[in-house]
Amino acid sequence: MKIQLVAVGTRMPDWVETGFKEYQRRFPRDMALELIEIPAGKRGKNADIARILQKEGELMLAAIPKGNHIVSLDLPGKNLKTPELAQQMNKWLLDGRDVSLLIGGPEGLSPDCKKAAAQSWCLSALTLPHPLVRVIVAESLYRGWSINNNHPYHRE
């Protein structure tokens, strides 16, 4: 199974790149973590945010291979404890499809992305900067993988 992180934003600070890549490299080949970056729309004083969200959403959905299981990362989504995420990852694996996780930009995800998602996951009730979410998701997925594979990374 491949897990795709489809995220808005292309020029992240070095610490984001370093953090994401650290967890990405830990995954085995049979559960690869891939990052697809979508260019953020230009935002300014008079920017049409609804139009920017729509365009970002179109680009995100176009980047997802047909048949992938789509999960949005969004506030109204389901809060998962780490063992629940591990169970969810097992379900994804048994489903036999690759998974695409959608991370929106500063204003979140487009309505079309939310509609296309079969599931919605909420990392926190806190507002998190979208670059940080990449690192948190990568670490959380690695932790879930470690639980499922009896790897000593996760401790109860």
Curated annotation (Swiss-Prot):
Q: Where in the cell is it found?
A: Cytoplasm
Name the domain of life this protein comes from: Bacteria
GO CC annotation terms, alphabetical: cytoplasm
Name the reaction it catalyses. pseudouridine(1915) in 23S rRNA + S-adenosyl-L-methionine = N(3)-methylpseudouridine(1915) in 23S rRNA + S-adenosyl-L-homocysteine + H(+)
Q: List the InterPro entries hit by this protein, alphabetically.
A: Alpha/beta_knot_MTases, RlmH-like, tRNA_m1G_MTases_N
Question: Top EC class per UniProt?
Answer: transferase
User: rRNA processing as a keyword?
Assistant: yes
Show the GO MF annotations. rRNA (pseudouridine-N3-)-methyltransferase activity
EC numbers: 2.1.1.177
Question: One Pfam family name from the record?
Answer: SPOUT_MTase
Q: What is its main location?
A: cytoplasm
The keyword Cell membrane is annotated on this UniProt entry: no
Keywords noted in UniProt:
Cytoplasm, Methyltransferase, rRNA processing, S-adenosyl-L-methionine, Transferase
Which residues are listed for S-adenosyl-L-methionine binding in this entry? 73, 104, 123-128
Function, as annotated, reads: Specifically methylates the pseudouridine at position 1915 (m3Psi1915) in 23S rRNA.
What HAMAP family does the database record attribute to this sequence? Answer: 23SrRNA_methyltr_H
Family designation: Belongs to the RNA methyltransferase RlmH family.
Q: Subunit structure of this entry?
A: Homodimer.
UniProt cross-references to PANTHER family, sorted A to Z: METHYLTRANSFERASE, RIBOSOMAL RNA LARGE SUBUNIT METHYLTRANSFERASE H
What is this protein identified as?
Ribosomal RNA large subunit methyltransferase H
From which source organism is this entry?
Shewanella piezotolerans (strain WP3 / JCM 13877)
